[in-house]
Curated annotation (Swiss-Prot):
During catalysis, the active site Cys acts as a nucleophile attacking the alpha-carbonyl group of tRNA-bound glutamate with the formation of a thioester intermediate between enzyme and glutamate, and the concomitant release of tRNA(Glu). The thioester intermediate is finally reduced by direct hydride transfer from NADPH, to form the product GSA. This is Glutamyl-tRNA reductase. NADP(+) binds at residues 189-194. It is an enzyme of class 1 (oxidoreductase). Catalyzes the NADPH-dependent reduction of glutamyl-tRNA(Glu) to glutamate 1-semialdehyde (GSA). The gene is hemA.
């Protein structure tokens, strides 16, 4: 199989080097154009994300090797001093296809089972289609990968459970409150962690959502970005803490922004109605003693990490099932590819049989009636199709043992196993050598 994959990912290089070799959309398009226009490749695909830059190529010249492609990508980015061949992986033929399937199914991801990767793979494919740099080999590989990714999502639990702090916070919230949408929620903070937590909570159709932050303007900007949320001045937070069923904190600084006395006072106003406080800050935003107040559920990053670790372990348990799916599709892909190689032989074989048929029928054409000749022609066609059916099927599936001519012929014509004429009899002497003495 004439297919090469080279690239840099989180397994082969640190982030500072991955950044050097990464490609923007315009860079990827330029690289694809160069490879095809210079006749170096007949097909090419570029996948570049924050954790990987990978190049899949069907070479058009013998000199286009894995090392050639590594050097080409390094030169294209102008990073010879920083990045070397040692920072790359390389795969060939079915190994390249297997790696692509591992990527598409998210078992090669930094975060096992991430759902974003398949969208990134499809973007890479659509770009190559638009640039007309994919042909039958990469096209088949990509569509097989898309089908595998769908099957993995529907038939396994590889993508189940939270594996990020912000999503784990939501998962924990749902374990405590069956219907999060009816709860009043306060988000303390306006940074990246707070934003992710807010987005995940809003996905649960939360209606009453407040944002507070040390900088009022940042809280307003986050509310605008989210398209929802009421702003609560930070100085009013402790007085109104009792209004909220869920409080999520994610702010910087070394001081505890919520203390035991604040929560104790809030719980009296809530008449002991439970409150969940999720502290996503590092250092912690909430005093640890808050957890001592009755009916207060205080969870911090360590608690969420336990959920994440448990979910990751469950995901790892799904890997053998995913690999089984991949192996089955890889076999089918290899068979399909081999069928492309044998197609000219199959065409020649069919033409040869029909050529013999035509010659033999021509000899008797003037000796039989037109009706008889037509019936003989139809009969000959049916015989040829039946004679060739199994050989052609066998060739496409590459099941014949081509190292042994006798076994090969018996296999492609589906002949029954031969019984040994003289069972147990062997010839230890090489007859050819004996005749030369």
């Amino acid at each position: 199989m004439n297919l090469i994959a080279v690239g840099v990912n989180h397994n082969t290089a640190p982030i500072e080097l991955r950044e050097k070799i990464s490609l923007t959309d315009s860079m990827a398009r330029s690289l694809l154009t160069e490879l095809i226009d210079s006749k170096l490749a007949s097909e090419a695909l570029v996948l570049s994300t924050c954790n990987r830059t990978e190049l899949y190529v069907v070479p058009a010249m013998p000199e286009v090797t894995a090392n050639y492609l590594k050097d080409y990508l390094i030169a294209h980015k102008g990073v010879r001093k920083e990045v070397t061949r040692d920072h790359f992986f390389n795969y060939f033929a079915c190994g390249a296809a297997r790696h692509f399937y591992n990527v598409a199914c998210a078992i090669d991801s930094l975060i096992l089972g991430e759902v974003q990767i398949i969208g990134q793979v499809k973007t890479a494919y659509n770009r190559a289609v638009e640039m007309k740099t994919v042909g039958p080999i990469l096209n088949k590989m990509c569509h097989t990968g898309f089908g595998l990714a769908n099957r993995v999502r529907s038939k396994t639990k590889l993508t189940a459970g939270a594996v990020s702090v912000s999503y784990a916070a939501v998962e924990l919230t749902q374990k405590i409150y069956s219907d999060v949408s009816t709860k009043n929620i306060l988000l303390v903070g306006a940074g990246d962690t707070a934003k992710l937590a807010a987005k995940n909570l809003l996905d649960k159709r939360v209606r009453d959502f407040y944002i507070t932050n040390r900088t009022y303007e940042k809280a307003e900007l986050l509310a605008q970005e989210l398209g929802t949320g009421k702003i609560l001045p930070l100085e009013e937070m402790t007085e109104r803490l009792h209004e909220f069923d869920i409080v999520v904190t994610a702010v910087g600084g070394n001081d505890h922004i919520i203390k035991k006395e604040h929560v104790a006072a809030a719980m009296q106003k809530r008449h002991r109605d439970p409150i969940l406080i999720l502290d996503l800050g590092l250092p912690r935003n909430v005093a640890p003693e808050v957890g001592q107040v009755n009916n207060v559920f205080l969870k911090d990053i360590d608690d969420l990490k336990m959920i994440i670790d448990s979910n990751l372990e469950k995901r790892r348990a799904e890997i053998p099932k995913v690999k089984h799916f991949i192996q089955k599709e890889l076999i089918e892909y290899a068979r399909w590819y081999f069928s492309l190689e044998v197609k000219p032989t199959i065409v020649d074989l069919q033409e040869k049989f029909f050529e013999i048929k035509a010659l033999e029928l021509a000899r008797i054409k003037n000796k039989v009636s037109a009706e008889e000749y037509e019936r003989m022609e139809q009969l000959s066609d049916r015989i040829i199709k039946k004679l060739l059916h199994f050989p052609i099927t066998t060739l496409k599936q590459q099941t014949a043992d081509t190292t042994d001519p006798v076994s090969f012929i018996r296999n492609i014509f589906d002949l029954k196993e031969q019984e040994e004429e003289f069972p147990g009899l062997t010839f230890p002497i090489n007859l050819k050598e004996q005749n030369n003495n």
